[in-house]
Amino acid sequence: NKIIDKYSNIKHWYLCGHSMGGAMASSYVSKNKDKVDGLILLGSYIYGDVSAQDTLTIYGSLNTSVKKKIDYKKNIVVIQGGNHANFGNYGYQKGDAKATISRKSQQNQTIKAIDQFIKKD
């Protein structure tokens, strides 16, 4: 809230999180719907009372644990050949499948999807 209050000149806010950061972002948005225009989840899914209409969910096709948790149909982008760790730059993550596309490709596709989602509003 402090950041949003400090930058009151910014009229549209989107919160984004990867993995458990997505859970935290989703939790914040569910309690502060009046302050945020949208939620962007990378390798994560909606937690709490957040509209799928105002949420963009992006996950790699090889990140099957996320797919199992998604019970909504709107604003979902599946990056073919992508995995969980390639949304970040932290290397291999135990239990993650090996991506069949490069980290750069996955991140570029992610940027494009986020840009399109934000511009639609």
Language-model-detected regions and their locations in the chain:
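Catalytic active-site module of serine/aspartate enzymes centered on a nucleophile-bearing elbow/loop
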Residues: K94-D121
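Cap/lid segment of the alpha/beta-hydrolase catalytic domain
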Residues: N1-K2, Y92-G95
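The feature captures the conserved acid-bearing segment of alpha/beta-hydrolase catalytic domains
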Residues: D37-Y90
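Gly/Ala-rich beta-loop-alpha elbow adjacent to hydrolase catalytic centers
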Residues: C16-S26
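Active-site signature of alpha/beta-hydrolase-fold catalytic machinery across serine-
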Residues: S27-K31
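Loop/turn elements at helix/coil->beta-strand transitions in domains of secreted/extracellular proteins
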Residues: N9-H12, D34-G38
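Alpha/beta-hydrolase active-site loop
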Residues: N1-L15
